[in-house]
Curated annotation (Swiss-Prot):
Domain Radical SAM core: residue ranges: 11-231
Record-listed [4Fe-4S] cluster 1 binding positions: C27, C31, C34
Annotated GTP binding sites: R20, R75, T106, K167, R270, A271, R272
Keyword Calcium among UniProt keywords: no
Pathway terms, separated by semicolons: Cofactor biosynthesis; molybdopterin biosynthesis
Cofactor(s) it depends on: [4Fe-4S] cluster
Protein family membership: Belongs to the radical SAM superfamily. MoaA family.
Superkingdom: Bacteria
Ligand binding (S-adenosyl-L-methionine): Y33, G79, S130, M201
Binding of [4Fe-4S] cluster 2, residues: C265, C268, C282
InterPro entries membership: Aldolase_TIM, Elp3/MiaA/NifB-like_rSAM, MoaA, MoaA_NifB_PqqE_Fe-S-bd_CS, MoaA_twitch, MoCo_biosynth_MoaA/MoaC, rSAM
Name of the featured protein: GTP 3',8-cyclase
Length: 341
């Protein structure tokens, strides 16, 4: 068995460096831009347990991505990852993998008061919490379940108290929550957490995306600069998706993820593994590659490694660049709740 780490690049010379694992397609929220309640109702056919990759299967795949391809970062997503039973057990398995330097999780934060300490003890390093408003009634409307913003704020504080790194992501939509840009910036500036604004993206097929509803990075930063001046700073690492800005008074930083106005396809090094076990090479992909079938089909680690490498070598995705060139109209895409953000 060949256990040597090798560099694999795609058709555009982009290396594989980052793995995102969706552990469930279920969520306890029904956010309008991700899992709108009218489409994801009580009769929606969510994946059954046997359809999900088991923790042992996920561990095996993670070991290959880290040991064979040199992946150093794994992010756990959903749906809402904490809806998957016994998540600390999966994190323990991942934390034992030699060479894996960073284990992160994207979550809506509502279950962190229960799980934050257990996640930290298991080996999780940091969380990114999705929060789109501090105004309670607006937040309840956005999450579609009437969950109070206080529940998420409690989760953020629980994560901080447990010693987890914390960042906040806010999806900004014109006509929905642009009034929250400044209150969110002020609040998390005072709390000492990095807030990242995300341009409203056309992920999936159900969020009624229209470019007119996008508030761009330039507009967001211009608004903040009028009240709390910032200056741009360099990325932490090659391929970082957020543009970083530092407050001039030295009180921290913010970021903007601007997939619509600034395509970052050229440096994208992320592979995404869905809860069903399909490998996707782009957040905006139409289809994935059935890795679960290979895992359950008796392939050796060497054979599985070569199959994954072949998928990456043939990757040509550059959806955000194509969008800017109006080459994506009518393209059907996988839903974000299935592939993870």
């Amino acid at each position: 068995m060949n256990t040597e780490t090798r560099r694999v690049t795609d058709k555009r010379e982009r290396p594989l460096r980052d793995l995102r694992i969706s552990v469930t397609d279920r969520c306890n929220f029904r956010c309008t831009y991700c899992m709108p309640a009218e489409l994801f109702g009580p009769d929606y056919p969510f994946l059954q347990k046997t359809e999900l990759l088991s923790f042992e299967e996920l561990e095996r795949l993670a070991k290959l991505f880290v040991g064979r391809f040199g992946v150093e970062k794994i992010r756990l997503t959903g749906g809402e990852p904490l809806m998957r039973k016994d998540m600390p057990e999966l994190i323990k398995k991942l934390a034992r993998i030699p060479g894996l330097k960073d284990i992160a999780m994207t979550t809506n934060g509502s279950l962190l008061p229960v799980y934050a300490e257990k996640l930290k003890q298991a080996g999780l390093h940091r969380v990114t919490v999705s929060l789109d408003s501090l105004e309670d009634e607006r937040f309840k409307a956005i999450n579609g379940r009437g969950v109070s913003v206080n529940k998420v704020l409690e989760g953020i504080e629980a994560a901080k108290a447990a010693g987890l790194g914390v960042k906040i992501n806010m999806v900004v939509q014109k006509g929905v929550n642009e009034k929250d840009i400044l209150p969110m910036a002020r609040y998390f500036k005072e709390k000492g957490h990095i807030l990242r604004f995300i341009e409203f993206m056309d992920v999936g097929n159900t969020n009624q995306w229209n470019k007119k509803d996008v508030i761009t990075k330039a507009e967001i930063i211009d608004l903040i600069n009028q009240h709390m001046p910032t200056e741009p700073i360099e990325a932490n690492y090659k391929g970082e998706v957020a543009s970083r800005f530092r407050y001039l008074d030295g009180s921290g930083e913010i970021g903007v993820i601007s997939s619509v106005s600034d395509a970052f396809c050229a440096s994208c090094n992320r592979a995404r593994l869905s809860a069903r076990g399909e490998l996707f090479t782009c957040l905006f992909a139409s289809s994935g590659y059935d890795v679960r079938k290979l895992v359950r089909g008796g392939l050796t680690d060497d054979e599985l490694t070569e199959s994954i490498a072949s998928v990456w070598r043939n990757r040509t995705d550059q959806y955000s660049i194509d969008r800017a060139l109006s080459k994506t109209d009518g393209k059907k895409k996988v839903e974000m709740s299935y592939i993870g953000g």
